[in-house]
Amino acid sequence: LLGDMRMIKSPEEIVVMKQAGEIAGAMMQAAEDALGEGRPEYEAALAVINAGTRKAAGFLTDKGWKAFISPMIHNLQIMQSGTDTSMVHRRASVKPLAKGDPVYFCFCNMAQFKQYKLGFDRMFFIKELSDEAAEVQQTAIDAQQEAIAAMRPGVTAGSVAEAANDVYREPG
């Protein structure tokens, strides 16, 4: 029952959801802007927190009960780069970024505002994208599209996964 009720959003909730989206966008842009050859990973994580907090503060007031809503964006940034990109849920470190490094950000545990949480990930590359990295990214996109196309009522999760896995197997 509660799940069904939560599917219907009030105009106020829709405004908050849009604000949360703007905050998430500011966080993602700050992450990209902070990346650079030789810069440590944690600098990008700090930029994400600062940008999200500043954007959230712009939607708040110091009047009435709403004065008690904190703009603070916090948590440990999930971030992997270079040869550590496959280390799922690794946190930002002092490791310097190198030219050509893939840099993966997961904002799922950080992008939240007024109890609305947004889950999204982004991948960036330092200065350049190798042909091999571009092929890997395109394969992932193609597999995702096949999985989406396979989704329909009554289809098992296993068959959806198999549709994606077929795409992954093609290049070898």
Model-derived segments and spans:
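Active-site neighborhoods and metal-handling regions in enzymes and metal-associated proteins
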Residues: 1-172
